[in-house]
Design a protein with these regions (language model features):
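Active-site rim/adjacent substrate-binding subdomains
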Residues: 1-134, 139-176
């Protein structure tokens, strides 16, 4: 297993729609293992394949409390088949560093996909699980949490992020 590099905003791959996986072969299974390790190392509770530079319809997640054994889940080619209600919850994203915002989402969702053995699965989630599933499936559609907040908050984050990137690349000197 390997820890993969997480793509961060404004990497263009994050805005690309992921393609379905047509065959669950050894390379897909290795990607699943690497994504799980990367998610835990980050640390995070969900990760979509395009966040690690692979535009494939694949997500991993684990919302198990920290004081309990890990229990990662995998969904290949997931799709939301039903949703209802609404909720707002503060979210963060491994691809949107150092930023948290209230995001409005459905309160309950049902998602259908395949597990890592290629078996059909259906997940019904509410609360945090519903948020994680919607957040990760958004990634597969090229949608970031930034796209779900107000234009003002988005503009402020983009400005701050550009400043961070310039500073990190040595293009802007730090004040002495």
């Amino acid at each position: 297993m390997a820890v993969l590099e997480i793509c961060t905003y404004p990497n263009p791959i994050l805005k690309k729609k992921a393609v379905p996986i047509t065959e669950i072969d050894d390379s897909v299974l290795q990607l699943v293992e690497d994504m799980i390790e990367t998610m835990y190392q980050a640390p995070g509770i969900g990760l979509a394949a395009n966040q690690v530079g692979k535009p494939l319809r694949l997500i991993v997640y684990d919302i198990t409390p920290k004081d309990q054994p890990r229990n990662p889940s995998v969904l290949i080619n997931p799709e939301i088949i039903s949703c209802e209600g609404s909720q707002s919850q503060e979210e963060g994203c491994l691809s949107v560093p150092e930023y948290y915002a209230e995001v409005k989402r459905h309160a309950r969702v049902t998602v259908r996909g395949l597990d890592s053995r290629g078996e059909p699965v259906e997940i019904c989630g509410e609360g945090l699980l519903a948020v994680v599933l919607q957040h990760e499936l958004d990634h597969l559609e090229g949608v970031l949490m930034l796209d779900r907040i107000s234009a003002l908050k988005r503009a402020l984050y983009k400005k701050r992020r550009q400043k961070q990137l310039k500073s990190n690349d040595g293009l802007v000197s730090s004040p002495s």
